[in-house]
Amino acid sequence: MSNINLATLDISEHPNLPSSSAVLFEAKAKKKLSFEAIASAIGRNEVATAAIFYGQAKASAEDIVKLSEVLGIDRFYLESLLSGFPDRGKSVTFPPKDPLIYRLFEIVQNYGYAYKAVMNEKFGDGIMSAISFSTTVEKETDLDGNNWAVVTWRGKWLPYSRF
């Protein structure tokens, strides 16, 4: 028997998620599909795909058709769940309680000003977009057999306007 790691969802622990999340995660678990497999089937990045499941990204009409096919969910039902605009930012309590999400928060808390200083030196006065943005997660194993998470953020640089 293979050991497959699958992200699942206990909706009772996430009352702020949209109703689509429970439907999508239930189908994902039933089909035993990883986000990587679903992303490949719909032609999206795996983090972007997971964001759709958590109601943090908008699914296109094409995404909805492909998700209905890969997950075995009626297309019209899925369309009714996913056709609105995401209500971003409500899914996580603050500060986060989940240890991994808290560590991501902690990285920004500890290194945020350092990131800001280095970016300002490289690009000038501005911000990194979280809208014109992409991210990847890779697994890297070192020579000692230790696994490392490699998280890449790629955001368009937006200089502040002078007015």
UniProtKB/Swiss-Prot annotation:
The record's annotation in Gene3D superfamilies points to: Cyanate lyase, C-terminal domain, lambda repressor-like DNA-binding domains
Keyword Iron-sulfur set for record? no
A single Gene Ontology biological process assigned to it is: cyanate metabolic process
InterPro entries, A to Z: Cyanase, Cyanate_lyase_C, Cyanate_lyase_C_sf, Lambda_DNA-bd_dom_sf
Q: Which UniProt keywords apply?
A: Lyase
What are its E.C. numbers?
A: 4.2.1.104
Question: From which domain of life does this come?
Answer: Eukaryota
Q: Which GO terms describe its molecular function?
A: cyanate hydratase activity; DNA binding
**Name the UniProt record assigns to this protein:** Cyanate hydratase
User: Catalytic residues per the record?
Assistant: R103, E106, S129
The reply on keyword S-adenosyl-L-methionine is: no
The UniProt similarity line reads: Belongs to the cyanase family.
